[in-house]
Amino acid sequence: MPLNVHPDIISLSPYVPGKPIEELQRELGLARIIKLASNENPLGPSMKARAALSQGAETLHRYPDGGAFRLREALADRWKVTPDQIILGNGSDEILGLLARTFLAPGDEAIMADQTFVIYKMEVTAAHGRPVIVPLKQWRHDLQAMAGAITDRTKLLFLCNPNNPTGTMVSASEVERLLLRVPAHTVVVFDEAYFEYVRSQQFPDSMAYVKQGRNVIVLRTFSKIYGLAGLRIGYGVTTAEITNFLNRVRPPFNVNSLAQRAALAALGDDEHVARSRAVNAAGMEQMVKGLAALGFAPIPSEANFVYVDIGRDGRQVFEAMLREGVIVRHIEGRMVRVTIGMEEENREFLAALKRVVHPALSAG
């Protein structure tokens, strides 16, 4: 008997993550692998977070705090909001799913860019909503076109800032103009996973929009600069009214106790965050200069990765780099995304890329 699967689910393709280090080691028998595919912090978690994990092992037989009281209190204090304005997720990805399930009825619309975080489209489709795709303009969100795409059925508008995979950002003045055109029935989702890496002074203060009581939610994560990707924990800051509805569809105990402990400790380690920013800034300069020396011009990035036109089939370059023991992320066509690593990792990546794209020069 055939399965009776909803057509929207049939239309989806499973998410394909960056290739795991262990998998490549098994396939090629390589001892050393450099992974620059998933925008992880090369420093890893702070020592405070590691210590918190060790201490948390003693209570693993107990269910976690379902309301994440201590972590929500700390986040509320950090962003000067109330704890009932904070929602925790098993990664910020989970909160994207909660938003889709909460706000989308079948056929309702959600606006997003064409080259942005793929999970938006997946979650909207899984909730039987309709993704409305607006092309990027010069690698950046076209906020004017996104505002023009809003209809009576638009319930969500996703703004990944800085954008993944391009690394580009939209400014405060651009966002202000967008918000003037957003009706009350549309919730704007500021997905700011890479917020802590931003250097531009023009970046919008999205938390201010929350405090103004607007229908917005700001998503942040502990997976990137805090180095806790393996624990899956992220959070949203919004109005108490919106969190109230999101909590109605949030699974119980969705954030495990180790993740809560580590995130709380990481949040209090500003020194580790500062060091991570410094490593990224130095690595970004090294990467941009190294790519330029090879004839490539990556798109200016405000995140912890670069997006670059590699000048040839990106899939072939990706596969050739795997054989060199380097994992990057092929996005589409000639475009490849590369995470900023430690100095030695960046140097080895650039040397491997030179061997792949300029073999004659490398041999010489």
Give a label for each model feature.
Residues 173, 319-364:
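PLP-dependent enzyme catalytic core of the Aspartate aminotransferase-like
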Residues 102-159:
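PLP-dependent aminotransferase-like
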Residues 61-109, 127:
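Phosphate-binding glycine-rich loop
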